């Protein structure tokens, strides 16, 4: 035990002179490890008498604790110095210009949907929604679409089974509304619809807004005035509008609505194929069979319905010539609509 004090002094001096954490670890192993110098002294206790052994063991443990405390203290000092050096080297240069933040914006389809809804809610319509996974009855049968109609073909409709499908229009929402309430009914039905079609002007998923008004004494003149006013407000300028006779199973009479080309003001251009007119929606008076199947008396009530593609309206309003741009998630395109 004669050299215990000298060994402790040597260890403490080495600890204080160490310059990094790795050196401290080597000193810990040298003095306190399994084969360390202070640990080795514990093995000499067996050579001492029973009376000397407790006192000698206590001295060795005190020495080990003293060295361990010195190691811990020095390690803390070195770690603080290392942290300070790291912070100094990584400090932020506040004189550099900031990166800034890019503000987002509404998608052009969302903007168009909101614009359509805003017009119709201002004139007394309410917004109605329904399921996108629809049954055959509400999507076809209740709308007077017979079993042999081409729209029911597999190449036009996404079927889950013989009775369930992805809705091909938002008209089922109109049927469900008429089934659940009696006239007067004034609703617009925005939402996603699905068809087996994909090209420059068609997408397998797109958005529609359909409208329905059912009440006593409703005529085609009411439909005509509503659509003309909507197009004037939506495009923010007076436009020529014409109604061409057409056929839809759920309306009679039916019409396609054309408006004066917004690109050339009706003079003829590539967009309107030199006709001066653009097709924008379909419409008509609700077929008596549709009213009857929904539980509404067609002898007492009449109504009109219309439907338009939201992407089609957005393309015309913003001058976009490819429908697929709306779904490509290209920020260079979308950033134009902030």
Swiss-Prot record:
EC number: 6.1.1.20
Keywords: Aminoacyl-tRNA synthetase, ATP-binding, Cytoplasm, Ligase, Magnesium, Metal-binding, Nucleotide-binding, Protein biosynthesis
Reaction it catalyzes: tRNA(Phe) + L-phenylalanine + ATP = L-phenylalanyl-tRNA(Phe) + AMP + diphosphate + H(+)
Superkingdom of the source species: Bacteria
Subcellular location: Cytoplasm
Cofactor(s) needed by this chain: Mg(2+)
Binding-site residues, Mg(2+): 252
Example GO biological process: phenylalanyl-tRNA aminoacylation
Keyword Phosphoprotein assigned: no
Gene3D superfamilies hit by this protein: Bira Bifunctional Protein, Domain 2
Annotated GO MF terms: ATP binding; magnesium ion binding; phenylalanine-tRNA ligase activity; tRNA binding
Note describing how the cofactor binds: Binds 2 magnesium ions per tetramer.
A GO-annotated cellular component: cytoplasm
Signal peptide extent: none
Alphabetized PANTHER family for the sequence: PHENYLALANINE--TRNA LIGASE, MITOCHONDRIAL, PHENYLALANYL-TRNA SYNTHETASE
Subunit-structure text: Tetramer of two alpha and two beta subunits.
Family in the record: Belongs to the class-II aminoacyl-tRNA synthetase family. Phe-tRNA synthetase alpha subunit type 1 subfamily.
HAMAP family: Phe_tRNA_synth_alpha1
Protein's recorded name: Phenylalanine--tRNA ligase alpha subunit
Name of the gene this protein is made from: pheS
